[in-house]
């Protein structure tokens, strides 16, 4: 699990940097009532983040040993970790939407929604799912690992719904 968490953190840093870097641009233009630039900046952010998330997802699915070899050379551990990483990172394709929308909520002065969405993903969904899902699948370990992509998918759907409702209000 430590390797998986490390890979998740290591791989998410560029995406977080990208989304946090776009925040002041979106915020400045929102404050200046330049809504067209807000929308253009968000679209550029979303496209850039989607490209990175897609690349990350492809690497995790096709060549996960690239990440795992950084942390271990033990063949048995690497084999098990490859299986687990593919499950754990299955929804990494969706990270672009989650993080781009969360940071844009902050840029638009709606930090409370952003905090709620961050808590939704890791606290309100992931922790209960880690305890619940193992009871509903034949392999309880699989249930623990699949909790991450299930929580991510639900959180992204919620984030997208809330964001696009807010986005329509921009005009």
Residue ranges of each PLM-predicted region?
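Short runs within selected transmembrane alpha-helices of multi-pass transporters and secretion channels
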Residues: 16-20, 88-107, 113-122, 144-160
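Small-residue-enriched core segments of transmembrane alpha-helices in multipass membrane transport
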Residues: 6-9, 86, 119-128
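Short alpha-helical transmembrane segments in multi-pass integral membrane proteins
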Residues: 26-91, 134-171
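Small-residue-rich hydrophobic transmembrane alpha-helices
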Residues: 1-64, 95-114
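Residue-level signal for functionally critical sites in structured catalytic/ligand-binding pockets
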Residues: 1, 6-10, 73-74, 106, ...
């Amino acid at each position: 699990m430590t390797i998986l968490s490390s890979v998740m953190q290591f791989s998410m840093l560029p995406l977080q940097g990208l989304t946090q870097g776009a925040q002041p641009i979106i915020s400045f233009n929102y404050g200046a009532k330049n809504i067209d630039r807000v929308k253009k900046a968000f679209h550029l952010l979303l496209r850039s983040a989607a490209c990175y998330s897609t690349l990350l997802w492809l690497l995790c699915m096709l060549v996960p040993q690239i990440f795992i070899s950084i942390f271990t050379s033990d063949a048995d551990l690497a084999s098990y970790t490859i299986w687990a990483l593919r499950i754990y990172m299955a929804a990494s394709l969706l990270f672009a939407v989650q993080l781009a929308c969360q940071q844009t909520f902050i840029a638009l002065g709606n930090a409370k929604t952003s905090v709620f969405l961050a808590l939704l993903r890791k606290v309100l969904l992931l922790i209960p799912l880690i305890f619940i899902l193992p009871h509903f699948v034949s392999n309880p370990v699989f249930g623990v690992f699949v909790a991450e992509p299930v929580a991510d998918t639900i959180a992204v759907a919620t984030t997208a719904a809330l964001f696009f409702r807010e986005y329509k209000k921009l005009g």
